[in-house]
């Protein structure tokens, strides 16, 4: 979900930070990856090996803050694409927005959730 003015704000933020290669909209994730697992044969292991003792059992408030890129807006310098042959570069500037504006649409159910979120913030009226 992209509120009015977000594109202009993102371009402005990138222009104000000449050492940044790009800007990406992010938000706090609904699930912390420090509490996620991956399958390793018959067993599971933590997705991230952080060195934090039993990180999967720690309160999320004590874990490092992470952000989820939600695809709402990416602003990229042409020099990043041409010179670095990258869509993000090495220095990505965050633009943190409310997670209520995150919409990951993969199926009809997630589309309905996104439509409800749009209505709740006044989009489409």
Short names for language-model regions:
Residues 65-125:
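Conserved alpha/beta core of the MobA/IspD/sugar-nucleotide pyrophosphorylase nucleotidyltransferase superfamily
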Residues 2-90:
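Conserved core of the sugar-phosphate nucleotidyltransferase
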